[in-house]
Amino acid sequence: MKTVRNIFGTGTLYDSPDLQGKIYATCAACMSVWSDFLSWANVHKERMVKSIEDADTIVVLCCQVTDLAVYNDIKVCERLNKQTGKSIFISGCLAQRFDIDLPDYIKRLDVVRVKNQPLYDKTLVHYEPPFWVKGFEETCETLSLKQGDLFRNFYPLKIGAGCNGNCKYCTIRHTRGEGYEMSARDQVDEFLAFDNVVLISDSPTVKQIKDWCEIAIENNKEISFRNMEPYVLVACEKEVVDLSRKGLLRILHCPIQSFDDEVLKIMNRNIPATKKAVEIMQEVRKSGTLVATNIIIDYVHNGKVYPNYYKQLLEEKFDYFAWNPYFDGHFDLKRAEERFDKYIV
């Protein structure tokens, strides 16, 4: 346990040694956060339980990308607390948000991860269904384009964490713990050992993408990329297109966030790179690569609302897209509940 100060204030964070006995863990966050704790769980497999009734300690991995996500996090914790009467440790991005008040039964846990650890057993950490998809049904498909299912059944190869970007709407650079970047050559054995590999990082670097394109071609093995920023895709255009033309790039996920130059400028995003990235994604589609993206809808700036939902363009340019409603970073439980009812229909 330690006292931590960050841009969100000062608070107490517990560490992995504070987790007692048998542990049940579930994830209501993204694959980056899920695979973090999963790496630790695979090292301490004998302590992980798959039934919450057998647990001494409960961990919920949480998100804070929108107030809807925070609201869902709280609801998951509330459900498990009522079910067991136990305190809940939360890890992931929400744990670092000391400005967001949480129920007394919740304890904040720092980022828990083991670098360069193969994830032999992905079932050690339960994955909550995507809250924005009502009636979500699990599948075993790896090429499902059903909402909320992208990469869900892939093998998450952890190549790093953290982001040095300065997008105005994003706080990842402050909530993901100490950032790191793995050398691709150090993870070749892991890449070869598992099927349906997707690279997992909050923001893969140019060097990582170029190296992994080379490795995939050397080994004639399919790979997928997630969270590749537009400027990275542009810098790696030749390598990515070559990989796709060889039939080895299965899915390319690149978050463009908007088609609108004005909105991109407000977001502090790279406008030329975004436009070029969309062009590159159309090029790799010709070779059979599936392309996916994220956007932020109802973006607010200086009191003006930008709907930012170009449905026809999104359906034309992408095989899969997901959206988040703009979140100003100030969490209010009542407002979050109202917005949850508005957007999750």
Positions of PLM-derived features:
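Canonical Radical SAM [4Fe-4S] cluster-binding loop centered on the CxxxCxxC motif
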Residues: 1, 148-185
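N-terminal [4Fe-4S]-dependent radical SAM core
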Residues: 1-21, 118-157
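Cofactor-cradling patches in redox/metallo enzymes
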Residues: 2-122
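Glycine/threonine-rich flexible loop motifs
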Residues: 67-76, 178-180, 262-269
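Aromatic/hydrophobic pocket-lining residues that form the small-molecule binding cavity
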Residues: 70-73, 184-187, 209-212, 236, ...
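Conserved SAM/AdoMet-binding glycine-rich loop
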Residues: 88-89, 96-97, 192-302
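Structural recognition of alpha->loop->beta junctions
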Residues: 102-121, 216, 240-254, 308-322
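Radical SAM enzyme [4Fe-4S]-AdoMet core and its adjacent flexible, acidic
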Residues: 206-219, 316-345
